[in-house]
Structure formats: structure tokens, C-alpha cells
Regions:
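Sec-dependent signal peptide recognition
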Residues: 1-7
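Hydrophobic h-region of N-terminal signal peptides that target proteins for export
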Residues: 10-18
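Phosphate-group recognition and catalysis centered on beta-loop-alpha active-site segments
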Residues: 17-371
Length: 371
């Protein structure tokens, strides 16, 4: 865990704003999930409206082979399925990447069944305001998300990036009989998404990225945690992956690495060698995940004892920018853009309202969002 001390922040905080590199990417982690339930069209649209460069849908498969957006294939934490008596018999326990998980799983539902569910906030104790949207939004498909992106591109006149992650591809291939890499390439082609669009495809598993590298020209990102290793390569550790030799190997099939913040910043807030080592290998570095609440910040950046209170996320962003990362995944798109001083994307009024306890976009009506 990162444990920054206050003294380490002084030089970074001497100036209130940062000059943002125009190539620095703000990636909406599960959409604007700090303000709407994650992986809903409402979260993605809000992120786009707030200026995100990319939106990030995590993809799992339904029983009938449709990609839908959920952070994991167990859907009990983020939908109302537990309250739906007609699906009670679908509750089960599975071994997902070696871990026993009990709940309801996307691959056991048809798309028609999933369409009847509604999303809910994952962490209401930390983000209670998001819980007011519980029950409003359905689970979107990849096609729904692409249609939203195309509509917002037409509306705004700017290009909007897609940054999908294939979740648990080895498990889902065994469970569904569908190769997620092949299926994703076919789906993107069907939806007229090409490598000329703004697309990164990410995964923790190496085989699926290698397969995508052989099948397509899409940009690929190897996800890397601080510990453990890819489930498809038990003899390989993530620690080995972030060495110069490991990064050179990653560069044979991927264009970048998506890494935990702890792999970019040392305990005192100074940068590790990862960014420079990745650059030597020709890889971009996107760091995850920036969240504004104390519960997710290093102790030295927390303000008060309340985990739900907003801490000094701007200092964390300053450190990441100083470390030279090429972009960040964030739940909090507008605060991130404002803190980074992204003049191309931010709105001065919205940024001014960040210090006020009020919504910055109109509250949707239930009849507008419930299908």
C-alpha cells in the first residue's frame, strides 16, 4: 500500500495547477462510477459529458454469448438479482480463477433475463449519493455502449475512446465454449469499430492478448497487479513482468501496460523505474485507479477520519503526472480533469462547482431510463 507522508508532497503542491500533457489520457473507470452506478449507460454518458478521453467497459458473457458490461461475472454486488425470486435457483458457488465465489453469474443468464435486472451502487457506504440511482439502469451490452459512443461523437464532434477489458477469459471460455478474443474481434467488426478508432483492449491474461495480437491491429494493454501473476501462466509473476526484460517480453504482443498505482509510485511518493523502463520497451503506461475518497487514498493524502470524505486526490494526480504516466483510470472524471488542468476538456463552471455539494448535471427521470 502507498503511504505518502505530508513532507513528500510539498514540492508537488507548491503550484495549484498542473500543465497537462496533451497526450495524457483520462480513462473513465467503469464510466463516471464515482457519480453513477458503475457500468451503466448513465455512467458512461456522464463521463463523456465531463470530458473523458476513453470509457472503460469490463466485458463478460451471457449464456447466449452476448458481451455485457460488468466488472466481474458475479452480478450480485452490482444488480438487484438477489431480490428477484424468479432467479433464486441460479445462485451457486463457482471457482473463478482459483477462488470460490458464491452468487449469480452472468454466464448463467440469457441476455433477455439480464435485461430485466437493474444496476445498483457497489459501495453505498462510501458513495451514498450513487444509491439514489439504484434500480434505474439496466445492464448494457457492448452494442449499447458502442451506439452511445457513436451518438455522443455525433453530438459533440469529438472522438471518444473505448477501453474494454476481457474479464476472466480462461474461465469464460471453459464455461461458455466461446473464445472471448475471437468473439470480441467479430463483435467489433460487426459494430464497425476498427483499429483506426480510439480503442485499447486490456486483460490480465497473456494468452488472450497474444490471440488478439494475431487476430487484429487493435492496441493492447497488459494489466499488471502488485502481486501474484497471470492465472493462465502460473510460472510467471507480475513482479517479473515489470522488470526491463519482462516489459520487453510484454512489448512483443502489447502496446502498453495498465498498472496498479503502487507499481508507479514508491512509499514516499517518488516514482519507481517502471515508466522509464516501459518507455524503453516502447510501451505506454496507464495507472489505476484514482478515486477521491479517503478510503482509497494513501494515509498521507487523507483528510480526516471519514473514509467517504474527499481527500487530497489532486496530490496523487500530481505525483502520477510527475512520474510520467501516459494516463490514469479514474472513477472521478471531472475532479481528475479539473485537478490536472486539462484546458481542452474541462469546464470552468463545472470545476468551480466541485467544492459545492450539488449535482452538476440534471437528475434523470425514472421514466427516461427504465426500459
Amino acid at each position: 500500500m502507498l503511504r505518502f507522508c505530508a513532507a513528500a508532497l510539498l514540492t508537488l503542491l507548491a503550484t495549484p495547477g498542473m500543465a497537462l500533457d496533451e497526450d495524457f489520457l483520462v480513462i473513465a473507470h467503469r464510466g463516471a462510477s464515482g457519480e453513477r452506478p458503475e457500468h451503466t449507460l448513465a455512467a458512461y454518458e456522464r463521463a463523456i459529458d465531463q470530458g473523458a478521453d476513453y470509457i472503460e467497459p469490463d466485458l463478460v458473457l451471457t449464456r447466449d454469448g452476448v458481451f455485457v458490461a460488468r466488472h466481474e461475472n458475479e452480478i450480485g454486488q452490482t444488480t438487484d438479482v438477489a431480490s428477484r425470486t424468479e432467479f433464486a435457483d441460479k445462485r451457486t458457488t463457482k471457482s473463478i480463477d482459483g477462488v470460490a465465489v458464491t452468487g449469480w453469474f452472468a454466464e448463467d443468464f440469457t441476455l433477455a433475463e439480464l435485461r430485466t435486472l437493474r444496476a445498483k451502487e457497489r459501495i453505498p457506504a462510501i458513495r451514498p449519493a450513487n444509491a439514489r440511482f439504484d434500480g434505474l439502469y439496466p445492464v448494457p451490452t457492448l452494442e449499447d455502449i458502442v451506439r452511445l459512443v457513436r451518438a455522443k461523437e455525433a453530438e459533440t464532434g469529438r472522438r471518444i475512446g473505448l477501453y474494454p477489458e476481457l474479464k476472466h477469459p480462461s474461465f469464460l471460455q471453459r464455461a461458455t465454449g466461446i473464445n472471448p478474443a475471437d468473439h470480441l474481434v467479430r463483435e467489433l467488426e460487426r459494430l464497425e469499430i476498427t483499429p483506426q478508432d480510439l480503442v485499447f483492449i486490456q486483460s490480465f491474461e497473456t494468452w488472450v492478448l497474444g490471440r488478439l495480437d494475431r487476430l487484429s491491429e487493435f492496441k493492447l494493454v497488459q494489466l499488471i497487479k502488485p502481486d501474484g501473476g497471470p492465472v493462465d501462466e502460473p510460472g510467471v509473476t507480475y513482479a517479473e513482468m515489470v522488470t526491463p526484460d519482462g516489459l520487453a517480453e510484454v512489448a512483443t504482443y502489447a502496446d502498453g501496460v495498465g498498472v496498479n498505482l503502487a507499481l508507479v509510485l514508491q512509499a514516499d511518493g517518488s516514482p519507481t523505474s517502471l515508466v522509464s523502463d516501459a518507455a524503453q520497451a516502447g510501451l505506454v503506461v496507464h495507472a489505476w485507479t484514482v478515486r477521491k475518497q479517503n478510503a482509497f487514498l494513501p494515509p498521507g493524502l487523507r483528510e480526516g477520519e471519514d473514509g467517504a470524505a474527499v481527500g487530497n486526490y489532486a496530490a496523487l494526480l500530481a505525483m502520477l503526472e510527475s512520474a510520467g504516466v501516459d494516463g490514469v483510470f479514474t472513477d472521478d472524471v471531472l475532479p481528475t480533469i479539473c485537478a490536472l488542468g486539462d484546458e481542452a476538456n474541462n469546464d470552468d463552471l463545472w470545476c468551480a462547482l466541485l467544492s459545492r455539494d450539488q449535482a452538476r448535471l440534471p437528475m434523470p427521470r425514472a421514466e427516461d431510463v427504465v426500459e
